[in-house]
Amino acid sequence: AEIGWTDVTKLAADRRTLNLSDQLYRSIGSISANVAEGFSRGSRRDRARFYEYAHGSAREARDWYYKGRHVLDAEVVDHRLRLYSEIVRLLLTMIPEQRGASLSEPGPVYEVDPLNLFNNVPLS
């Protein structure tokens, strides 16, 4: 959630995106919280359930960033869309490992270079 703090602050400053900023902050905070809670669960089934919640929150965060594109800098939005797409991809690997099934995300395919997501992070 730390990376989104300045983004949420910028969105909250614009009356048109005040509600969007709250939804974005909740969704990005929910990702790590659900991964942490899932990791602490004793059964694979419980772990998978919390990873699925995190997956939904990551998709939601990505959607809120897209909707906030008119207020946030284009470079920031591009980075966050790629970052949350990578998180979705990682969770789609983690969930089947716990469930024993396969999942995949349908297009559009976002090009993501995971090594560059944390270098020169743009801030709003």
How does the language model describe each region?
Residues 1-124:
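Short, C-terminally biased terminal segments at protein or domain edges
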